[in-house]
Each structure stands twice: as structure tokens, then as C-alpha cells.
């Protein structure tokens, strides 16, 4: 409707997604912006009225128990260093299929160790950083494995000996 309500309770839509037909079929960028601002204004007014008469409430989040164990900061720092050194040594500027294979193996082991941290330890920003680092490293190694050519700043060595 013109207040942005949808058929899903407590979900509003504004702008073109609201399908108000405010400007008809002539869709210009300038009218789309105007429609967005206008519908947002009316939706906000309707929402404030709903909140004032308590017709709207946020669901309470479910509580869960956080694991009591904290991950050892030394282990997290060491694993992060392992990821960085692995990338530097095996997936750096000079690459080879053998080095990339070794990097992949090391990173897969690290990923499993980090998964065990997640299962038994409280999640911290450092643990999230470590998880993201190993995921990113695995993506880089995978992409590098798919590119056998020397291109840009990376040089692929041929290991025929």
C-alpha cells in the first residue's frame, strides 16, 4: 500500500520495490529517486504510528550458551602467522604447482584446526580474523592453481627437472 506495507508482517517496501505506481510507466532516474524519498517518508510516518500504539514489536532474540572455553591467543597468533608465512613462501610472487599444492595442504590443516576452535571456544574478533584469513588464502591458492601462466606481478616457474 502507500504506507509501504507488504503482505509479510513488519516488512515494508519503499521506492520502486513498493510498486506504488506513483509515476506510472515512465521510469526516469529522477522520478525513481523522488518516489523512493516520498514512499520512505510515508512509510516512516506509518511505522512511527504503529510503534506509538504498540502495533509493532521486535521479536526477542533467542539466547544461547556461549562456550566457556576461550581460544588460546598464542595459538590463534601462531595460526595466523602460519597462514601468512604459507602464503608468502608458497603462493607469493614466484609460484609453482608443487608450492601451491603444499600451500593448499597446509591451509586445509589450518582450516580444520580453526573449525575445532569454533566448535569448542567462544568466538572473538581474533578468531574471526583467523577464519577469514585462511578462507581468503585458500581462495587465492585455488585461483593461482587455475592460472598456469606468468601474468601481471606473478611468475610461474616450470619444475621440470
Predicted regions and their residues:
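Glycine- and aromatic-enriched mobile tails/lids
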Residues: 1-13, 17-161
